[in-house]
Amino acid sequence: MSNVELRIENIVASVDLFASLDLEKVIEICPHSKYNPEEFPGIICRFDEPKVALLVFSSGKLVVTGAKSVDDIQAAVSKLVEMLSKIGTKFGRAPEIDIQNMVFSGDLKMEFNLDAVALVLPNCEYEPEQFPGVIYRVKDPKAVILLFSSGKIVCSGAKSEHDAWEAVKKLLHELDKYGLIEEEA
């Protein structure tokens, strides 16, 4: 497993700012933003640094997406809080950030016969006419891994990098248990 690589592709977090927001004022201070209350009840705000998108609601709740690290989420929230403070927004307490989903891409550095994998691997689906990968569901930690014949994987649903690694370890354990991992010469 030492040669397996995982890379964060996206992190989604929900945030509570513990403040009520006047979205008409907020839209004026958010660069690269869009607000059309007839279509959507929040502001869609994009930051270039860190490169994320935020959905900002009058309740003071946010959804942050597009982040490549938890630090990016914290930086984006801090940046927004600083901007909101300048227009007189009062906060009940420090923002609360809750990671909802992390998406990783990876490479197991080996190829797989997905028909063979689907025959023996529990908790998986494989419909090659509809999707070219095996969908493997891990219950604990909760995650879904897409496994392709090239050995490339996508892991989603994890709430931390540790959870993603644990899910990948479980997949590798199952693949090994059923004799689906070729030993390198």
From Swiss-Prot:
Q: Where are the transmembrane segments?
A: none
Q: Where are the sequence repeats?
A: 8-84, 99-175
- What Pfam families does this protein's entry cite? TBP
Signal peptide coordinates: none
Q: Which InterPro entries match?
A: TBP (IPR000814), TBP_archaea (IPR033711), TBP_CS (IPR030491), TBP_dom_sf (IPR012295)
Instruction: From the record, give the cysteines joined by S-S bonds.
Output: none
State the Gene Ontology BP annotations: DNA-templated transcription initiation
Sorted keywords for this record are: DNA-binding, Repeat, Transcription, Transcription regulation
| CDD domains, per database record | TBP_archaea
GO terms (molecular function) for this protein are: DNA binding; DNA-binding transcription factor activity
Q: Which family does it belong to?
A: Belongs to the TBP family.
Q: Which HAMAP family match?
A: TATA_bind_prot_arch
Q: What does this protein do?
A: General factor that plays a role in the activation of archaeal genes transcribed by RNA polymerase. Binds specifically to the TATA box promoter element which lies close to the position of transcription initiation.
User: Per its record, how is this protein called by name?
Assistant: TATA-box-binding protein
